[in-house]
Amino acid sequence: MKVIFLVDVKGKGKKGEIKEVPTGYAQNFLIKKNLAKEASSQAIGQLRGQQKAEEKAQAEILAEAKAVKKILDDEKTRVQFKEKVGPDGRTFGSITAKKISEELQKQFKVKVDKRHIVLDHPIRAIGLIEVPVKLHKEVTAEIKLNIAEA
């Protein structure tokens, strides 16, 4: 019997996969526990439609990420920060991913999720700093920061 897996089943199939399994196993286990459904022509058509919609959505997200990368890679895109500095040359406050995200939105109208900004630790130094940002699993860019003394 052909079934469409609704969830990953270890050793049998992954979600969205169409596979031939023994009839008894399909009826008594997979279908009863909502792990799979029978692969009728209507169900297969529905699955193909969902997969196409998902691919289209992923392509749009990737295109958006590439557009943001183009903006961030532009030399003019440099996020400005004015911070109070102590006698040792370190800032009093630290610059976090959240602060960078907010300033990027404020100064350039570019929305980047703070969780995508890769910071090992908050920035406390002044000067020009480049911070990597993972916009998509395939797209990585760098945000240029200019941290000056207030």
UniProtKB/Swiss-Prot annotation:
SUPFAM superfamilies named among the record's database cross-references: L9 N-domain-like (SSF55658), Ribosomal protein L9 C-domain (SSF55653)
GO BP terms in the entry: translation
Classification via Pfam families: Ribosomal_L9_C (PF03948), Ribosomal_L9_N (PF01281)
Domain of life: Bacteria
GO molecular function terms attached to this record: rRNA binding; structural constituent of ribosome
PANTHER family (alphabetical): 50S RIBOSOMAL PROTEIN L9 (PTHR21368)
Protein name: Large ribosomal subunit protein bL9
Natural source organism: Streptococcus equi subsp. equi (strain 4047)
Highest classification ranks of the organism: Bacteria, Bacillati, Bacillota, Bacilli, Lactobacillales
